């Protein structure tokens, strides 16, 4: 039986995955030699604080902006989107791509993160 969106354990896992995505995005930005402000400018954001929110796990890269973010950090757009999908929608990622160990994010325990 599916869990409710209000399920605290699921919410904790979702939060942990968003934080992992944020760390991955920050590492990609830093590897590209960009500041948050420079990335924001390259992807057409008015405020760099959105980049900060995404990197801290409080926000998500919108689907329609993932190609621009990928280009800005020098990543293949398809792989970039696939990586974000595994963090943002792990069940959909599993259905589309299976449970390949290299693609599966580590499910965090409710108390960790």
Question: Predicted regions span which residues?
Answer:
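DNA major-groove recognition helix of helix-turn-helix
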Residues: 54-55, 65, 84
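Residues within the helices of the helix-turn-helix
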Residues: 26-27, 37, 67
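Short, charged recognition helix plus adjacent turn
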Residues: 6, 81-113
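Residue-level signal for the short linker/turn that defines the boundary of a DNA-recognition helix
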Residues: 23, 33-34, 46, 61-64
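DNA major-groove recognition helix of helix-turn-helix/homeodomain DNA-binding modules
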Residues: 62-80
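Short alpha-helical DNA-recognition segment
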Residues: 31-53
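A short, Lys/Arg-rich alpha-helix, primarily the initiator
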Residues: 2-31, 108
């Amino acid at each position: 039986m599916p869990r409710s969106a209000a399920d605290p354990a699921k919410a904790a896992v979702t939060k942990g995955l968003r934080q992992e995505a944020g760390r991955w995005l920050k590492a990609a930005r830093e590897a590209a030699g960009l500041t948050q402000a420079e990335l924001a400018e390259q992807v057409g954001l008015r405020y760099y604080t959105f980049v900060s929110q995404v990197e801290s796990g409080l926000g998500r890269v919108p689907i329609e902006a993932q190609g621009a973010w990928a280009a800005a950090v020098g990543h293949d757009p398809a792989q970039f989107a696939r990586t974000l999908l595994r963090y943002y929608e792990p069940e959909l990622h599993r259905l589309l791509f299976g449970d390949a160990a290299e693609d599966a994010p580590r499910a965090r325990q409710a108390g960790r993160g």
